[in-house]
Amino acid sequence: MPTIQQLVRKGRHDKSAKVATAALKGSPQRRGVCTRVYTTTPKKPNSALRKVARVRLTSGIEVSAYIPGEGHNLQEHSMVLVRGGRVKDLPGVRYKIVRGALDTQGVKDRKQARSRYGAKRG
């Protein structure tokens, strides 16, 4: 515990809150290039093959981003738009790819929640 004299000299400083989406550098989304597209398994108790892409962002940082929806057209060197939002059962995946933007196609035959998956009407 500091003495009053030490507090007079230095004072106390607040800890700044850690940002959940640091790689976006304050932007709502960032563009990036896929360096690897792969599937991975979620942690217990879930079981699946989740689609994930390793993306090098324009900020220079490389992150893992989840590819939402059923089916995708992404491969290495695809240009993607990345937004924040973690996937609870995939450790280390704190970003999602925006469907229907840049090289990412929207989800085919999607009827509900279309805007989230870049699906056109009809």
From Swiss-Prot:
UniProt key word tRNA-binding: yes
Domain of life: Bacteria
Record-level GO BP terms: translation
Record's signal peptide: none
GO CC annotation terms, alphabetical: small ribosomal subunit
Record keyword Methyltransferase present: no
Positions carrying 3-methylthioaspartic acid: 89
SUPFAM superfamilies (UniProt xref): Nucleic acid-binding proteins
Keywords: Methylation, Ribonucleoprotein, Ribosomal protein, RNA-binding, rRNA-binding, tRNA-binding
Pfam family, one: Ribosom_S12_S23
Listed InterPro entries: NA-bd_OB-fold, Ribosomal_uS12, Ribosomal_uS12_bac
GO MF entries: rRNA binding; structural constituent of ribosome; tRNA binding
Quaternary structure note: Part of the 30S ribosomal subunit. Contacts proteins S8 and S17. May interact with IF1 in the 30S initiation complex.
PANTHER family membership: 30S RIBOSOMAL PROTEIN S12 FAMILY MEMBER
Family classification: Belongs to the universal ribosomal protein uS12 family.
Summary of the function given for this chain in its UniProt record: With S4 and S5 plays an important role in translational accuracy. Interacts with and stabilizes bases of the 16S rRNA that are involved in tRNA selection in the A site and with the mRNA backbone. Located at the interface of the 30S and 50S subunits, it traverses the body of the 30S subunit contacting proteins on the other side and probably holding the rRNA structure together. The combined cluster of proteins S8, S12 and S17 appears to hold together the shoulder and platform of the 30S subunit.
Name of the protein described by the UniProt record: Small ribosomal subunit protein uS12
